[in-house]
């Protein structure tokens, strides 16, 4: 799979970012199966962003729990979110606190 080595994760249009964007390393996560994060990917089609239609399109933090929220794609307790996965790993090297991923704005 051809993925960018490094990228910056930002909220999609319509969502308010309250913290700094996240520098993300695909290379640093290469040992994981791509579907760990891209859980709707079939292994063949182009990989879509989390905010793509059919995924986490709701940019609000409130509302029906059945609607996948963009925020929850990264912050839920589920092991298919960034925070949930890192907490489940319980590794000292993995970020689990807000400031670990979201550096203070300068």
UniProtKB/Swiss-Prot annotation:
Protein residues bound to heme c 4: 75, 98, 101-102
Positions contributing to heme c 3 binding: 29, 82, 85-86
Pfam family, one: Cytochrom_CIII
PROSITE patterns hit by this protein: MULTIHEME_CYTC
Keywords: Electron transport, Heme, Iron, Metal-binding, Sulfate respiration, Transport
UniProt PTM comment: Binds 4 heme c groups per subunit.
Binding site for heme c 1: 26, 34, 37-38
Domain of life where this protein originates: Bacteria
GO molecular function: electron transfer activity; heme binding; metal ion binding
Binding site for heme c 2: 39, 50, 55-56
Gene Ontology biological process terms from the UniProt entry: anaerobic respiration
Matching InterPro entries: Cyt_c_III (IPR002322), Cyt_c_III_dom (IPR020942), Multihaem_cyt_sf (IPR036280)
Note: The second heme binding site has an unusual CXXXXCH motif.
Function description: Participates in sulfate respiration coupled with phosphorylation by transferring electrons from the enzyme dehydrogenase to ferredoxin.
Record protein name field: Cytochrome c3
Organism expressing this protein natively: Maridesulfovibrio salexigens (Desulfovibrio salexigens)
């Amino acid at each position: 799979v051809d993925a960018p080595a490094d990228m910056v994760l930002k909220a999609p249009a319509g969502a308010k970012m309250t913290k700094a964007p996240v520098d993300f390393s695909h290379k640093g996560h290469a040992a994981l199966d791509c579907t760990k994060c891209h859980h709707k990917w079939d292994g063949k089609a182009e990989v879509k962003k989390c905010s793509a239609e059919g995924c986490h399109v709701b940019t609000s933090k409130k509302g029906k729990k059945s609607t996948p929220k963009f925020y929850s794609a990264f912050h839920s307790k589920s092991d298919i979110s960034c925070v949930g996965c890192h907490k489940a790993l319980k590794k000292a090297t993995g970020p689990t606190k807000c400031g670990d991923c979201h550096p203070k704005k300068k």
